């Protein structure tokens, strides 16, 4: 078991402890560290020496910048601290009332492409023999991005193609429809990009960190939990600003110029606050009951709970 995953196993089994950890790990200043510093921090927490308070910075650097499954340094733009600075503006832009279909599809394409790349980088690759991306996986990602881009632009497509001019119907397309659509597309994005894990399975470990074998049940559970957490992130980000506008409707009727800035700021604020919450819903060191895995793995497992790298 990798040192990062072992760290999550020992300290991240409660929601509040994970939330406190993620608040520290999402610090953008961690992006300034070099690969050598990251590898040094990872080797430090993997040593047999007991860590003290002075090593907290090394723990945060390792958990935020190296892969919990392999220990490899994550690409700069796909590290958790970079998620808000990069995807935040894309989320705000994708939820804007667009003037045409092309603008809506452009921002959806950027957002869905980044989310697909983020999910792929943070996948569980324990059963992959080749380090290069396969043609099947590449085609799956291209198809996922294409489909979610078109589906994400559906509200604007309805408005333009059906020539919707009625204010209630425009409100339905621009304020109500994006809520379930954002959650569903975020769920679908993770589910399809990481579909291979459900077919080939992922490595599971016993309570002592020893490898037990490869489990498809654990792979399905890992992908499902990650997809659900991403749906919560984007669904909440879409619904809260709309509720805010609804509650302050009378205020915005008197101050119409303030509605757009308040909406954009609330989207960015809710998205930023929900990132550590969604990342904390399930531990990166996922658990599964021994009875839930394949029969051939149950005999060689010690303890009632098995662990695996869930991904992000």
Residue ranges and their predicted role:
Residues 1-96, 101-104, 269, 273, ...:
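Intrinsically disordered, low-complexity N-proximal targeting/linker segments that flank membranes
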Residues 140-211:
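Eukaryotic endomembrane system proteins
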Residues 78-83, 103-108, 132-148, 169-182, ...:
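Transmembrane alpha-helices of multi-pass eukaryotic membrane proteins
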Residues 125-134, 164-168, 204-219:
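Membrane-interface interhelical loops and short amphipathic "cap" helices
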Residues 99-163:
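Long, hydrophobic, well-ordered secondary-structure blocks that form the structural core
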Residues 189-287:
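Long, repeat-rich segments with strong aromatic
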Residues 88-96, 153-164, 241-255:
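Juxtamembrane "helix exit" motif at the C-terminal ends of alpha-helical transmembrane segments
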């Amino acid at each position: 078991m990798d040192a990062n995953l072992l760290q999550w196993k020992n300290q991240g089994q409660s929601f509040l402890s994970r939330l406190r950890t993620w608040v520290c790990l999402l610090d953008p200043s961690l992006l300034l560290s070099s690969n050598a510093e990251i590898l040094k921090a990872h080797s430090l927490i993997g040593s047999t020496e007991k860590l003290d308070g002075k090593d907290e910075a090394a723990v945060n650097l390792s958990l935020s910048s190296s892969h919990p499954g392999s220990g490899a340094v994550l690409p700069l733009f796909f590290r958790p601290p970079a998620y808000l600075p990069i995807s935040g503006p894309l989320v705000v832009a994708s939820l804007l009332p667009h003037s045409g279909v092309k603008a809506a599809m452009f921002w959806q394409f950027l957002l869905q492409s980044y989310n697909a790349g983020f999910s792929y980088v943070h996948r569980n690759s324990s059963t992959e023999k080749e380090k290069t991306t396969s043609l099947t996986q590449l085609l799956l990602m291209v198809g996922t991005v294409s489909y979610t881009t078109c589906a994400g632009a559906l509200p604007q497509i309805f408005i333009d193609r059906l020539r919707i001019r009625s204010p209630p119907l425009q409100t339905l397309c621009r304020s109500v429809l994006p809520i379930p659509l954002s959650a569903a597309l975020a769920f679908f994005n993770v589910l399809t990009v990481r579909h291979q894990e459900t077919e080939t399975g992922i490595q599971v470990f016993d309570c002592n960190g020893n490898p037990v074998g490869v489990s498809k049940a654990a792979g399905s559970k890992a992908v499902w939990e990650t997809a659900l957490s991403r749906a919560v992130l984007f669904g909440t980000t879409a619904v809260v600003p709309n509720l805010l506008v609804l509650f302050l409707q009378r205020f915005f009727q008197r101050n119409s110029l303030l509605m757009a800035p308040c909406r954009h700021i609330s989207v960015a604020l809710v998205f930023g606050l929900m990132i550590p919450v969604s990342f904390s819903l399930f531990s990166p060191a996922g658990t599964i009951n021994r009875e839930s895995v394949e029969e051939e793995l149950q005999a060689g497992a010690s303890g009632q709970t098995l662990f695996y790298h869930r991904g992000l």
